[in-house]
Amino acid sequence: MRYLELGCISKTNKLFQKLQDLNPLLNIEIEAYSCKSSRRQRGRFVEKPLGYLLSALELRFPDYDFCGESWGSFRRKTLAEVLNEMTYSISTTHKNSDDVKEFVGFLEVILHRSVSLGGCEIFSYENRMGPFEDCLWYFSFLFFNKKQRRVVMLNAFMSRS
């Protein structure tokens, strides 16, 4: 797998950085990866969708080892569930519900531009250990589009301090 530089994601991450400057405990980012396996990844015998999800996590969080992870660390989600979870989590940091709804709607548009949501399988990474163990809340959604051979990862978390 390799990181994909997509214009809409780069611009969105710059906007997220401005939000993080206002609230340093909040971290939100989107990244896209191609699903072309490297030689090292081809040597592993892991189901393809799971292998792609784990590879994306490894690229984003190189300090953590995801080799022992299985399907038990992931949950399938619908787009409605993802949007509800994002709305709930972000509303804990920003009380204006209209702003939160607008923000989540903006994220949905960016995700749709990055990876066609209609053809996606959506997974949530559920393991509290590793990169998210010291967070008040977090979500890590992985959008896998087999046809586009792409994984888009949306991570957000609120640090404790």
Swiss-Prot record:
GO CC annotation, single: nucleus
Molecular function GO terms recorded: RNA polymerase III core binding
InterPro entries: Maf1, Maf1_sf
GO terms, biological process: negative regulation of transcription by RNA polymerase III
PANTHER family recorded: REPRESSOR OF RNA POLYMERASE III TRANSCRIPTION MAF1, REPRESSOR OF RNA POLYMERASE III TRANSCRIPTION MAF1 HOMOLOG
Protein name in UniProt: Uncharacterized protein ECU10_0060/ECU11_2080i
Organism per entry: Encephalitozoon cuniculi (strain GB-M1) (Microsporidian parasite)
